[in-house]
UniProtKB/Swiss-Prot annotation:
EC number: 6.3.5.3, 3.5.1.2
Pathway: Purine metabolism; IMP biosynthesis via de novo pathway; 5-amino-1-(5-phospho-D-ribosyl)imidazole from N(2)-formyl-N(1)-(5-phospho-D-ribosyl)glycinamide: step 1/2
Cellular component aspect of the GO annotation: cytoplasm
Subcellular location(s) of the protein: Cytoplasm
Organism: Koribacter versatilis (strain Ellin345)
Major subcellular location class: cytoplasm
Subunit text: Part of the FGAM synthase complex composed of 1 PurL, 1 PurQ and 2 PurS subunits.
A Pfam family of this chain: GATase_5
Name under which the protein is recorded: Phosphoribosylformylglycinamidine synthase subunit PurQ
Protein's gene: purQ
Domain Glutamine amidotransferase type-1: 3-231
Role description: Part of the phosphoribosylformylglycinamidine synthase complex involved in the purines biosynthetic pathway. Catalyzes the ATP-dependent conversion of formylglycinamide ribonucleotide (FGAR) and glutamine to yield formylglycinamidine ribonucleotide (FGAM) and glutamate. The FGAM synthase complex is composed of three subunits. PurQ produces an ammonia molecule by converting glutamine to glutamate. PurL transfers the ammonia molecule to FGAR to form FGAM in an ATP-dependent manner.
Amino acid sequence: MKFGVLIFPGSNCDHDAHWVLGQVAKQPVTFLWHESHDLENCDAIVVPGGFAYGDYLRTGAIAKFSPVMEAVRKFADKGGLVIGICNGFQILTESGLLPGALLRNEGLKYICKPVNIRVETTDAPFTQGLKKGEVLQVPIGHMEGNYVCDDATLAELKKQDRIVFRYATPDGQITREANPNGSIENIAGICNEGRNVLGMMPHPERASENELGMTDGFRIFESMVGAMAKR
């Protein structure tokens, strides 16, 4: 399974993702420059965290116009796996690959800390190797992680089982206190209707090695590899 990790001007988590996929997961992985029209026959695409184009205008607002994102849209439309992490999630919403938007955190401050997220569905390639209801510890690092959408979109996400992760307590309770940024209904990650595109604010690549003190995030990448092996 070959992964492609996008690089935009201002990305800063691209090398982290590349390291985890190549050195920890032992998968073929390549960098894809933002001006590229070619995804180089990759089986899965990672839209990494950072500050693409300096977050000018809005987070992800300029990145959506880059040539590589046009290629990613076509790739996703054909069922290709795409995971957007933090700024990558913001880019996916701006690009129309996922509904809703990410606003400034409720407390108007940048937040960088470990959080707990509960697995809400295993009916997706990204979580097929996990258990519904289990809790993962994964760090966040964002200023605009407050997920919002209109009532109709929220109802659709629930009906179609597309809420993939929610912020929770260590024992899996969905509480106001467990929500770090004010995200509607504690949403930490969602997928598209085809279930092949995931956007999440927490950083699984920062929780993928013992040296980092957390390894739960690596299981998301393992699930992707396992799902592709079954195709």
